[in-house]
Curated annotation (Swiss-Prot):
UniProt xrefs under PROSITE patterns: MAGE
Protein name as annotated: Non-structural maintenance of chromosomes element 3 homolog
Intracellular or extracellular location(s): Cytoplasm; Nucleus; Chromosome, Telomere
Alphabetized InterPro entries for the sequence: MAGE, MAGE_WH1, MAGE_WH2, MHD_dom
Length: 279
């Protein structure tokens, strides 16, 4: 089971492990502003009575899902169609779509450094503009070929870590389907997603992929590979997950403690092997 985040000020409700990486928890007031209004105003409109039985937590999770979807779709710099957003993410939340998009735009800009821009009013398509310096953008999350792994791979790494460092392939696809990524369908950006995750990422040593014995139907499990441990860390991945949910990494106490221990173990050999300076 995923660990639910610790709420700020009052206990958070139990997160559905099929819906996110561990829940969005409670948030404090935001000072960031989006185009057309303040973040606080947008949050208030999400809480309006028109949303019926939906809870604030459900709406926050939908915003997080939309942010992930936009980040993935932007990988090939092809305009993101509103029809795809409505089909793959928004679903029956169409009545609050403008506010969901506004909050997602705020999070993309103030957390990830991307500005969500509508190409033309009549085109109903969007692009993300990188507001950061090219050298700084995703600097900690690039592979040896300069490709950011903060897209699909980063999401898979986050799923693995938040599920206790091992996740079944079935659980991965249950999550990715909500982002419009299917194991049996060719994807515009990723080509063959199943091959990318279970073969390419495995061959590059970002992931380990093993069959789970005595399962019917047959299932597989995924874990971090040795290259992941060299190029990133549990703390960086946890911070990525926290950014998507607009939370603090400490809101997941179990994972945060594990990430801290990982940071300490990484620093220890470097300290021990540091050459002594002569006086």
């Amino acid at each position: 089971m995923l660990q639910k985040p610790r709420g700020r000020g009052r206990p958070s409700t139990q997160a559905d492990p099929e819906r996110d990486w561990g829940g969005a928890g409670e948030e404090g007031p935001s000072t960031s502003r989006a185009a057309g209004g303040s973040s606080q105003g947008s949050r208030a409109s999400l809480s309006a009575p028109t949303v019926g039985p939906r809870t604030q937590k459900q709406l926050e999770l939908k915003v997080a899902e939309l942010v992930q979807f936009l980040l993935i779709k932007d990988q090939k710099k092809i305009p993101i169609k509103r029809t795809d957003i409505l089909k793959h993410v928004v679903g029956d939340y169409r009545d609050v779509y403008p506010n969901l998009l506004k909050l997602a735009a705020e999070r993309l800009q103030y957390v990830f450094g991307y500005k969500l821009v509508e190409l033309e009013p009549k085109s109903h398509s969007y692009i993300l503009i990188n507001m950061l310096e090219p050298v700084e953008a995703d600097a900690e999350m690039r592979g040896d070929q300069g490709t950011p792994i903060s897209g699909l791979l980063m999401i898979v790494l986050g799923l693995i870590f938040m599920k206790g460092n091992t996740i079944t392939e079935t659980e991965v696809w249950d999550f990715l389907r909500r982002l419009g990524v299917y194991p049996t369908k060719k994807h515009l950006i990723f080509g063959d997603p199943k091959k990318l995750i279970t073969e390419d990422f495995v061959r590059q040593r970002y992931l380990e992929y093993r069959r789970i014995p005595h399962t019917d139907p047959v299932d597989y499990e995924l874990q971090w590979g040795p290259r992941t441990n060299l190029e990133t860390s549990k703390m960086k991945v946890l911070k990525f997950v926290a950014k998507v949910h607009n939370q603090d990494p400490k809101d997941w106490p179990t994972q945060y403690c594990e990430a801290l221990a990982d940071e300490e173990s990484r620093a220890r050999p470097a300290t021990a092997s540091a050459p002594a300076t002569s006086s």
